Amino acid sequence: MIDYIKSPVLKFKLIRLLEKNQYTFDVDPKATKTDVKYWVENFFGVKVIGMNSHRPPRKMKRMGPTIGYPVRYKRMIVTLRAGDSIPLF
């Protein structure tokens, strides 16, 4: 079940959210907010107080002579209680 959380996202705009105690993860498209909250709280030992999710727009990719779309994913922004932090970041 931990496969719901694919990877943390470290981009310039999202790094600024770390100052607000918000962490961003790419998750499985089938994952719900409840699933991700459960795994973040149990795996990292923190308290989640808010979550936002969105699906970034798809962009065309050229793969040799063919044009296609990469696999879709969902992105979750997790807000933690003041004083909590995730050691990965």
Curated annotation (Swiss-Prot):
The keyword Chloroplast applies. SUPFAM superfamilies: Ribosomal proteins S24e, L23 and L15e. GO terms for cellular component: chloroplast; ribonucleoprotein complex; ribosome. Keywords: Chloroplast, Plastid, Ribonucleoprotein, Ribosomal protein, RNA-binding, rRNA-binding. Its main location: plastid. GO terms for molecular function: rRNA binding; structural constituent of ribosome. GO terms for biological process: translation. It is found in: Plastid, Chloroplast. Pfam families: Ribosomal_L23. Belongs to the universal ribosomal protein uL23 family. PANTHER family: 60S RIBOSOMAL PROTEIN L23A. Part of the 50S ribosomal subunit. Binds to 23S rRNA. HAMAP family: Ribosomal_uL23_B. This is Large ribosomal subunit protein uL23c.
